[in-house]
Amino acid sequence: MRLRTPRQVLLILSLLAAAVPVVNAQEALRPRDQPFPGIIELQVDATNVGQKIFKVHERIPVKAGRMTLLYPKWRLGAHSPAGFALSQFAGLVLTGNQQRLEWKRDPLDVYAFNVDVPAGVTHVDADFEFLSPVERNQGAIVATPEMLAIHWEALLLYPAGFYAHRVIFRPSLALPPDWKFAGALESTGEAGAEVRFKPVNLEELIDSPIYAGRYFKRIDLDPGAKVPVFLDMVADNPGNLEGTPQQIQAHRALVQQAYKLFGSHHYDHYDFLMALSDEFTFAGIEHQQSGENGVRTTYFSDWDRQQAWRSNLVSHEYIHSWDGKFRRPADQLTANFNMPLQDSLLWVYEGATSYWGHVVGARAGLVEVSQMRDGLAATAALYDHRIGRSWRSLQDTTNEPIITQRRPLGWVSWQRAEDYYSEGELIWLDADTKIRELSGDKRSLDDFARGFFGVQDGRHEPLGYTFRDVVDALNAVQPFEWASFLRARLDGHGPGAPLDGIARSGWKLVYTEQPSNFFKDEEAYRKVTDFSYSLGFGVDSDGRLVNVVWDSPAFKAGLTGGYTLLAVNGRAFKAELLKAAITAANSGSEPIELLLRKDDRYVTERIDYHDGLKYPHLVRIEGTPDRLAEIFQPLK
């Protein structure tokens, strides 16, 4: 045993003593399932849309002593501490009895603000601003001269030490003159430009965004129903708000097909919050009683070319009311918004939602069945070429939101991204067709959806689940080795994507020289010409290479994203010229010559590729049942 000197002993004791206040401070932050005494008054002034500045005033009941206020860190739909950047929170001043109270940021948690409340102070007033992005490189634009979104998690502080559902707020909101608004919160009245809402707990408040705008239109999607469902739209121009009767009917059918699938609802009313804008850039996120949908101004006017976007967004966010918000992974049932989430079951939360979003969208007529097939082909091809599965399992990609927080990746085909969305969808198609096959087409994943997500009709409180719960629910529909079935697909390394569900549905993935309409629409929407399955890259409208595929011909030639393509075989680059060169090389022996620029360097690369253009499609397997047709069939 090594003896210590008196000086060493004193040093150790002093370090231990210094650690005690830190431990005690962290213990004080730990949430407890007890009611917060009093109601927090929250006033948000959102009238300065020109500068996109939101001013906030809070009055928080307090008692004398140390108090910690938290700024929300974790956002459920983002699956990470992404959400709104703490750097956009500014101007914090705390006062008590009109005297300024100095706050100090917690040394172990930058989202926590400590303040010593003097004796005799019963309320602390907090004033600050949320400086929402003014340019796209700062984050999503949530305020324009015509519209705004209120995300309460960016606009409040809340006391540490309590479960979120035990902290009550009384919110109010000041809007620009003559603007109209919608959201899940219940209004108690308006006084001038200020709207007052009923008291609500913190968990429900953060799950209840408000959309408001100069040009606003509400459409009842379930007329006469006891539980209303509305499409609430704000737009850059009033003309953007006009849809045809057939287009509106597709949204109404979406609601009915979801009800027929799940047999339940978990909201008092539901609002499809939709921003039709080329300036507002917040894409979308799910909530239990509403869904945010950021679409282009041409949502209605260019209807046929935006089918994928409707199923990837509008129906997807609606399905989340059941899958993700009501039924929620147990490791995401945290006590407040500053406790870390765990994302192990995102292949259910997002993967199954992606599957049902496409299926229910097709059943409702929101998307054509042929487009859904072509979209499925594109998904299958993308993940069949996702070479990164050789080292990284799909299960591990559920950590991706926390790792990258959706920052761009240089080599996504090798690194992998949030693959649990679309590859998760392939797994659920696999499960659906397996149930149909084993049951002689008497049962399907529809039965799982009703039995797992459709329980306890009308309940709002989240109901957690584990991997074992998913397996048990599948076995209740169709006995099978579901645990090993799922784990093989979640933990495996290929080769290739899990495409058994496509084959079992009576189709197979092939490649032809002609893109599908779906593929062309996606290229137009992304402003990219996609050569992923031939040369191994995409080219944007400026000629820049994007998403160079790992181990593709382009990769082997030494190319990366960021190169600008200047010429093809000695002629100025055009997308059609490159397509023609790839086609010509299919019957010749000469390599394809590309002149490119990266920064101030010019390079010429000769790619020895002779296999033609390749675009994914699904074709029928003769003599097999067409289970895809059955899956997309509207429920009666």
Which functions belong to the PLM regions below?
Residues 1-11:
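Bacterial N-terminal signal peptides that target proteins for export
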Residues 26-75:
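Early extracytoplasmic/domain-onset interaction patches
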Residues 39-41, 53-57, 66-68, 112, ...:
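Intrinsic-disorder/low-complexity, polar/charged segments enriched in Ser/Thr/Lys/Arg/Asp/Glu/Gln
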Residues 58, 220-346, 352:
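Juxtacatalytic substrate-recognition/specificity segment
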Residues 291-300, 326-327, 338-389, 595:
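Post-HExxH zinc-binding segment in Zn-dependent metallohydrolases
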Residues 357, 367-636:
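C-terminal recognition in membrane/secretory proteostasis and scaffolding
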